[in-house]
From Swiss-Prot:
Domain of life: Eukaryota
Annotated coiled-coil segments of the chain: none
Binding sites annotated in the UniProt record for NADP(+): 84, 109, 133, 158, 244, 248
Name of the protein this chain belongs to: Short-chain dehydrogenase anuD
Recorded phenotype for the gene knockout or disruption: Does not affect the annullatin D biosynthesis pathway.
């Protein structure tokens, strides 16, 4: 006889009843009291529910194969020479994308990826390889300049790093630089090209930030300090084992802030630029190759037990840029809009206050990198 009791998880159109004794035990046995009202079932902590929700998504949900037609469209993917970025590129080629810009830190590796994609899909003359080092603001600004006159229908901001080593890059801890600061530097610098594309081709471009469901693990108490980024840049205080999920929490909050900023500065006579963020789920990729020791081993075990393939993860990238304006300012999970998958902190009033404060801090940092960048958030009359 089991002493633990069932917990009900609702995701999408279905319910899952599991036994929870903490956050590690998962069973799909159906108990005798399955028919009881959910209100009679025991409550568990937010952390436990988040873990169970994650397991449900990883084990029982498979994002659908995308079918949206991208004919005539140009899509940029950062971090596209391997992993889910590479698989998203393969899906887009299958879905008739007319121009695919692969942005990779190494032009050589980017070209190898392009050659492989052409062989796999039989499509040639579609891929354009561009060098982009997200750890270097000059590389980011040069890339944005090269894109100024391009038609751009969608930007998938997928490039990111996962490391437990505290390393400086562009005057900030490298995870913050790559996953957050320079990612938003690029997003804002591309706005003029996106607005030009919107007006010229009567389209509604999309910027999509690849986040992570691991953002639910932390509530970022540092947001209450005078300068959050300064605290996160303190080597002595840095908790690097938390840095990746914290960077993704920052990315989600700031993506929502950016969407709000664009809403307050709508363009004249054209549709708004769509901004969203999403989780691809936990996928087998090279992202954790720089994580070693017991944490690396734990992540390896988790990958073996629950991880999606990069092909399945790549589906979520394509889904994020195919949702249309209904996804503006929203969060996607398993390939569809799912605000309930956000952490309680993000959805709380405290989360909104943190979002507004962090946006101000981010813009101060970006103004130092590119004076006047804030003006790009408002369209030219």
């Amino acid at each position: 006889m089991r002493n633990d009791r069932p917990v009900r998880i609702t995701r999408g159109s279905g319910d899952l009843y599991v036994y929870a004794t903490g956050i590690t035990t998962l069973s799909t046995n159906f108990p005798d009291d399955l028919g009881k009202s959910p209100s009679t079932l025991p409550e568990i902590s937010t952390a436990s529910m988040s873990a169970l929700s994650f397991l449900y998504s990883q084990l029982f949900v498979e994002p659908p194969v995308p079918t949206h037609d991208f004919q005539g469209q140009t899509v940029i993917i950062t971090g596209s020479n391997r992993g889910i970025g590479f698989e998203a590129a393969r899906h887009l080629l299958r879905l008739n994308v007319s121009r695919l810009i692969l942005a990779a830190r190494s032009a050589e590796k980017g070209q190898i990826a392009a050659d492989t994609l052409e062989q796999l899909t039989g499509r040639s003359g579609v891929i354009q390889v561009e060098e982009l080092d997200m750890a270097n603001q000059e590389s980011v600004q040069e890339f944005a300049t090269r894109m100024e006159m391009c038609r751009i229908d969608a930007v998938l901001l997928n490039a990111g790093i996962y490391t437990h080593d505290f390393v400086w890059a562009d005057n900030h801890e490298s995870t913050l630089t790559v996953n957050v600061i320079n990612t938003f530097l690029l997003a804002i610098l591309l706005l003029p090209a996106l607005r030009r594309s919107s007006k010229t081709w009567v389209i509604q471009p999309c910027i999509s930030f690849v986040a992570s469901d691991r953002h639910v693990m932390y509530d970022l108490p540092e947001w209450k300090t005078q300068n959050t980024f300064q605290v996160l840049n303190d080597r002595q205080q840095a908790r690097m084992h938390e840095r990746y999920p914290i960077s993704k929490l920052l990315e989600i909050l700031l993506a929502r802030a950016m969407a709000k900023q664009l809403d307050s500065n709508p363009p004249n006579g054209t549709g708004n630029i769509i901004v969203n963020s999403f989780t691809p789920g936990y996928c087998t990729s090279g992202l954790i190759e720089n994580v070693h020791g017991i944490t690396g081993f734990a992540l390896w075990l988790l990958s073996k037990a629950t991880a999606r393939t990069t092909e399945v993860g790549g589906r979520t990238l394509v889904a994020a840029i195919a949702q249309g304006d209904k996804s503006h300012g929203k969060y996607l999970n398993d390939g569809h809009i799912d605000e309930s998958a956000l952490s309680p902190f993000v959805r709380s009033q405290e989360g909104i206050l943190a979002m507004e404060k962090l946006w101000e801090e981010l813009m101060e940092i970006l103004e130092q990198k590119r004076p006047g960048i804030g003006l790009l958030l408002s369209p030219v009359p």
